[in-house]
Amino acid sequence: MTTAAIIGGGVIGGGWAARFLLNGWDVRVFDPDPEAERKIGEVLANARRSLPGLSDMPLPPEGKLSFHADLGEAVTGAAWIQESVPERLDLKLKVYRSIQEACDPGAILGSSTSGFKPSELQEGALRPGQIVVTHPFNPVYLLPLIELVTTPENSPEMIERAKEIMRGLGQFPLHVRKEIDAHIADRFLEAVWREALWLVKDGIATTEEIDEAIRMGFGIRWAQMGLFETYRVAGGEAGMKHFMAQFGPCLSWPWTKLMDVPEFTDELVDLIAGQSDAQSGHHTIRELERIRDNNLVGMMRALKAQNWGAGAVLNKHDAALKPKALPDLDTADLTQPILTLSRAVPLDWTDYNGHMTESKYLEAFANSTDRFMEIIGCDADYIAAGGSYFTAETHIRHLDEAHAGARIRVETQMLLGQGKKLHLFHRMYEGDKLLATGESFLLHVSLETRKPCAPSPEIEAAMARIAEAQAGLSYPEGAGSAIRKPA
């Protein structure tokens, strides 16, 4: 088990702790705040509810979390040390000195700083090349972007190792090759923030109206396509040059007060805080965090279905987890029902009753059928060559409830696999509890004629192998059932 040390257990430090812990790392936390354990516990509760459901594969077993009163004890032997202390350069440099006196020279020391350059953090350090900026975005346990900012002091080998570790956590390391104050993303956030302050101060818009302008329009566009690609599309068939020619004159118009900052007075603070309370004060912070996480999970899973943006990052992480998560024809115990799905129930799989909605049982069983098809050789290459299976009939029994975050698995028994016919019986479990069964009858088809036909000899052989191995299994209870006519 690999160990990470988290120095500073606030919102960001807690998010880092959750990201490492839920990806199988042991985590040691150092934070003198007597409330640190409670605060991190609340962040972890949110993370356990939301992060596992982003993946279509099971995450590794959760690591061990421990809290330490001694900084040296926390960092000794850690492979990754993440500093998330307050944004004071003198404090950070003091903390680095203490860390480097105790830590492994080969450990990566990442800073969550949103503003300082890595060269500033490396100044006077015992080992400057050990320190990099790894700037995350809240919630750290969900959002994949990490701005990895380096200097010539950092070796190429160390930089690649840092990237590899972050990718293993399901993150997207964006290597910022030239350091600058506030890196990349926070410079955009600061520009938008300054413009928003002016709009409120001048009475043009309220905090709620500004938020609506973002979340009802360009915020959604940016989330899926960014800034430049969005404008490229806006240019139509003529592309980016047309867009630039069309809107270039705007640069000389009074459309922004970007470099002109309103005076930061108590009156401005009270004005914005009051409007914000009126806008969102009916929700607690914890409620808002859960609303945020629900929305982020839904949006990122939608991007995942398109293999786009943050969704493509999630799919790559799933692909890395898959070989260890599900067996194939040669590694499965074919004498028993075969594991064809193992995952957590995502937030967007639940309904108004607070449990997994019926359409998602069908989706889960369909995914299990797809996995069984892969096991017998009907994979993407086979389908591209013109053969596949079509489902002719499905029957689902709902036997118990599943809730968001529940770790479920599906085990599949082949009742018939002969010629063009494939008859499967799926059982869905949470632990030892049987939640549902799904029965499917499929026909092998030619994608050219769209009519049933015999599968390849390789698929026939794989089905025969499974049929022989599972011959001793009893016929499942519930198989062949239908909804009975009411008495």
From Swiss-Prot:
- Metabolic or biological pathway, per its Swiss-Prot or TrEMBL entry: Amine and polyamine metabolism; carnitine metabolism
Which subcellular locations apply to this protein?
Cytoplasm
- UniProt-annotated binding residues for NAD(+): G8, G9, G10, V11, I12, G13
GO cellular component: a single term: cytoplasm
Q: Where is this region: Betainyl-CoA thioesterase?
A: 328-487
Keyword Phosphoprotein part of the UniProt annotation: no
Please give the biological process terms from Gene Ontology that the record holds: carnitine metabolic process; catabolic process; fatty acid metabolic process
State how it assembles: Homodimer.
Physiological role = Multifunctional enzyme that catalyzes the NAD(+)-dependent oxidation of L-carnitine to 3-dehydrocarnitine and the cleavage of betainyl-CoA (N,N,N-trimethylglycyl-CoA) into glycine betaine and coenzyme A.
Q: What is this protein called?
A: L-carnitine dehydrogenase/betainyl-CoA thioesterase
Q: What is the lineage of its organism?
A: Bacteria, Pseudomonadati, Pseudomonadota, Alphaproteobacteria, Rhodobacterales
